[in-house]
């Protein structure tokens, strides 16, 4: 009988380990912005060339926010330094479906310069944001 109870308890414990996965934690906007600021600061402090000097479209962050920043960085490939930034931006972009851009950007800038602009925008939003 004791062996039977032990087996049932063991199966119950193993069943809990095989559960679908952890419940995603809800992260507030200020914490996510702070995480993005830390990531962008780390990227800008590194003195090595960022993404082999790749170029991205210069966008108006004040008008489009994090979604246009994500769109601009999406076409960069083989650049491990910005993967975490892209993931954070994806979480901050609250757009449900792709939208059409009314005016196409016509200027490209280096990724390093874009990251610096994004850092300034994020810091300003963190200080004066509506949360």
Curated annotation (Swiss-Prot):
The protein's name in its UniProt record: Interleukin-13
Gene Ontology molecular function: cytokine activity; cytokine receptor binding
Knocked-out gene: effects: Deletion mice have increased eosinophilic inflammation and splenomegaly. In addition, mice show exacerbated effects of IL33 administration, including increased immune cell infiltration in the peritoneum with expanded eosinophil and ILC2 populations, and reduced circulating and peritoneal sST2.
Location(s), subcellular: Secreted
Cellular component annotations (GO), alphabetically ordered: cytoplasm; external side of plasma membrane; extracellular space
PROSITE patterns, alphabetized: INTERLEUKIN_4_13
Gene: Il13
SUPFAM superfamilies: 4-helical cytokines
Species classification: Eukaryota, Metazoa, Chordata, Craniata, Vertebrata
Residues carrying a glycan: 42, 52, 75
Subunit record text: Interacts with IL13RA2.
UniProt keyword terms in alphabetical order: Cytokine, Disulfide bond, Glycoprotein, Secreted, Signal
Tagged with keyword Metal-binding: no
